[in-house]
Swiss-Prot record:
NCBIfam families for the chain: PRK03545.1
Subcellular location: Cell inner membrane
Taxonomic source organism: Salmonella typhi
Protein task: Involved in the efflux of sugars. The physiological role may be the reduction of the intracellular concentration of toxic sugars or sugar metabolites.
Gene Ontology CC, one term: plasma membrane
SUPFAM superfamilies: MFS general substrate transporter (SSF103473)
HAMAP family in the cross-refs: MFS_SotB (MF_00517)
Family according to the record: Belongs to the major facilitator superfamily. SotB (TC 2.A.1.2) family.
Mode of membrane association: Multi-pass membrane protein
InterPro entries: MFS, MFS_dom, MFS_Efflux_Transporters, MFS_trans_sf, Sugar_effux_transptr_put
Domain of life according to the entry: Bacteria
Topology Cytoplasmic: residue spans: 1-14, 71-80, 124-135, 190-208, 267-274, 322-332, 385-396
Name listed for the protein in its UniProt record: Probable sugar efflux transporter
Length: 396
């Protein structure tokens, strides 16, 4: 059976390769969380000082997502992917060679530029490349690649960094990207730009109060999560007094729990998305409040991490599904905005965690993160009452 001139097998291979690319891009965004202590030691810096790199990366993505999407809106997509992968790979080689912290930050900015473009076009590309009638499954595959970055990418990156040095982790990600690029070159046809949206789309999106409310919810809840998550590795070692190996195990547990969250959302998300997101935010509040008390034992931290991982995965999937449902006419613009806003939250959370660790105490990151998490919970309840019909049930 063929689909337009290509077989279903080839169509799925294209989507899977794009999902692998999503895995690689998200792995490199998250992996510094597991390498902060090693990077700090190699440059003779404090962990909290190195942590500012997370904020810089996230805010570069936030600021550049929409401008880059608009600048490249007419560019043929296959060529655009090749160009951004070349930048991505070259920047990872520079990370590997970085002779001081400034050079490392510059290399991360280059990666962030590629990241900004990649995530503004990925959802629409997956839909275009999918076999007929399989668009939802294609988007699910991209989400799976994203989830696996936390489940496998971050812990594996940390293990590689522990045994071979953090530079090797970045080099390995670059080589993985090179292999993926070669696959994309072989598999992808020419992909003229379609329905990418333009500046004219922005006023239309800004006049959708449900969408704007979701963006606000996204930035607040992501800030809450990353206030604590950005510094979980040094927290485990310096505050809880546990081993570096356990920090790796904890990251694996937290990421692995995301699979459970993904399954829960896949089962119940179509009918109960709003309720699931609200419950997940409430669960996040509890996890952040219990982070310091749980630091008294490995078992308590491990159990807490399971619920934390489930909560953040349900929140992330819920937000993305709702945004896509509310902006089917300007997917690229809406997702570029979502990516930018999500990264504002990552950067803000990492910055708050940085300031708390430097000027107060790293032991307080859970309590401080719980403050915006509580605000997010109140906001979620308000907006889901105002727009009670789940977005998935709206007519398309």
């Amino acid at each position: 059976m063929t689909i337009n001139p290509v077989s279903r097998k080839v169509a799925w291979l294209r989507v899977v390769t794009l999902a692998i690319a999503a895995f690689i891009f998200n792995t490199t965004e998250f992996v510094p969380v597991g390498l902060l202590s090693d990077i700090a030691e190699s440059f003779h810096m404090q962990t909290a000082q190195v942590g500012i790199m997370l904020t810089i990366y996230a805010w570069v993505v936030a600021v550049m997502s929409l401008p880059f999407m608009l600048l490249t809106s007419q560019m043929e997509r296959r060529k655009l992917l090749i160009c951004l992968f070349v930048l991505f790979i070259a920047s990872h080689v520079l990370s590997f060679l970085a002779w001081n912290f400034t050079v490392l930050v510059i290399s991360r900015i280059g990666i962030a530029f590629a990241h900004a473009i990649f995530w503004s076009i990925t959802a629409s590309l997956a839909i275009r490349l999918a076999p007929a009638g399989k668009r939802a499954q294609a988007l699910s595959l991209i989400a799976t690649g994203t989830a696996l970055a936390m489940v496998l990418g971050l812990p594996i990156g940390r293990v590689v960094g522990q045994y071979f040095g953090w530079r090797t982790t970045f080099f390995a990600i670059g080589m993985g990207a090179l292999i993926t690029l070669l696959c994309l070159i072989k598999l992808l046809p020419k992909l003229p730009s379609e329905h990418s949206g333009s500046l004219k789309s922005l006023p239309l999106l800004f006049r959708r109060p449900a969408l704007m409310s979701l963006y606000v919810l996204t930035v607040v809840v992501v800030t809450a999560h990353y206030t604590a998550y950005s510094y979980i590795e040094p927290f485990v070692q310096n505050v809880a007094g546990l081993s570096a190996n356990f920090a790796t195990v904890l990251l694996l547990i937290l990421g692995g729990a995301g699979i459970i969250g993904s399954l829960v959302f896949g089962k119940l998300g179509n009918r109960h998305a709003s309720s699931l997101v609200s419950i997940a935010i409430a669960l996040l509040v509890v996890c952040l409040l219990l982070l310091l008390p749980a630091a008294d034992s490995e078992a308590h931290l491990a159990i807490l991490s399971i619920f934390w991982g489930i909560a953040i995965m349900v929140i992330g999937l819920g937000m993305q599904v709702k945004v896509l449902a509310l902006a089917p006419d300007a997917t690229d613009v809406a997702m570029a905005l979502f990516s930018g806003i999500f990264n504002i939250g990552i950067g803000a959370g990492a910055l708050v965690g940085n300031q708390v660790s430097l000027h107060w105490s790293m032991s307080a990151i859970g309590y401080i993160g719980a403050i915006p998490a509580c605000a997010a919970l109140v906001w979620a309840v308000l907006i889901f009452r105002k727009w009670p019909v789940t977005l998935e049930e709206q007519p398309h």
